[in-house]
Amino acid sequence: MAHQIEQMAYVGQTPWHGLGNQLSPNQPIEVWAKQAGMDWRIESSNVSYMAQNSRGQSIIMPYEEQRVLYRSDTHAPLSVVSQRYQEVQPMEILEFYRDLTEQSGFELETAGVLKGGKKFWALARTGQTAELKGGDVSNGYILLATACDGTLATTAQFTNIRVVCNNTLAIALRGQSSNTGVVKVPHSTKFDADKVKDQLGISVKTWYDHMYEMKQLTQRKVTQKEAAAYFDAVFNNNSLSAMEQEDNIIQYYRNVASQANPQPNKTEPNGRAMTKVMNMFNGQGRGADLSSAKDTAYGLLCAITEFVDHERRAMSTDHRLDSAWFGAGAALKQRGLEQALYLAA
């Protein structure tokens, strides 16, 4: 199977998926564009189709309500969109960071193209860092991504990357009504980089608010019963109420037993995944034995993020990256964050 990552560039250590061109630090945007495979434009053409007239002759007919988007370099098709669709160019994603890298101390760390150009992104380190107890370090990033195949609005969001395991966690803690943490620009609206930066509120406060909550999670000790209830809530979208926790722990051990003695046509939902994350929480995960994570709500969250980023079943590492940042995996991590904060409240 061909890689979904058409091309990618990075600085620092080789990414966990092992793909991309390594760059030395502080390269200009133009170098990033070439090495990350983003030095092309999205072009468009009106849709037409072949038909036959009454004499059996082939004629080309226009369909004026739709356009085909295609790559300027290879002319490969990307998607079919309406006339109202506002495309965002690959260079616009990189240009978003130009003043941030040149004037504000940000540093691009990775950028690339997925699905042959249908989706592209750039990730920059903000320079913000924090250390939880036990030497557990996290760094702050801003991820900007877009797609032209209808799968993603242009999205800018703060992201926390835990150093010990390279797990990513979107920082979007203030709910749908607030602009703090994430900004989404639908493709019915023209992308305005300056407006997005204003809405995103690129500030120290967002980072410190997030790390304060992570610290709260490290201080919330959890029992095995609470851990099982947490994973059940995350994977099966159940409640974490005290009344249900007894049932959840029983259900968890039923999952374990059903895998040891499988019965035909009878499997518990997400049993394999729940067993995996429980084992990661109990010491098999990266950094699971650090005092910040051992037997804490933060450890529960770290088990979820590591599972999504590194262990969850996927057709390829590229599909896993796409899911972990933009798809079902990202939603699972957000669910894990919400449930962990519920525990610590």
Where are these regions (language model features)?
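N-terminal low-complexity, intrinsically disordered segments
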Residues: 1-114
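Intrinsically disordered, low-complexity regions enriched in serine/threonine
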Residues: 1-54, 128-345
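Short, well-ordered loop/turn elements at secondary-structure boundaries
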Residues: 64-65, 117-118, 138
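Generic structural hydrophobic/aromatic packing signal, biased to beta-strands
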Residues: 69, 122-124, 144
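Beta-rich nucleic-acid/ligand-interaction surfaces
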Residues: 110-129
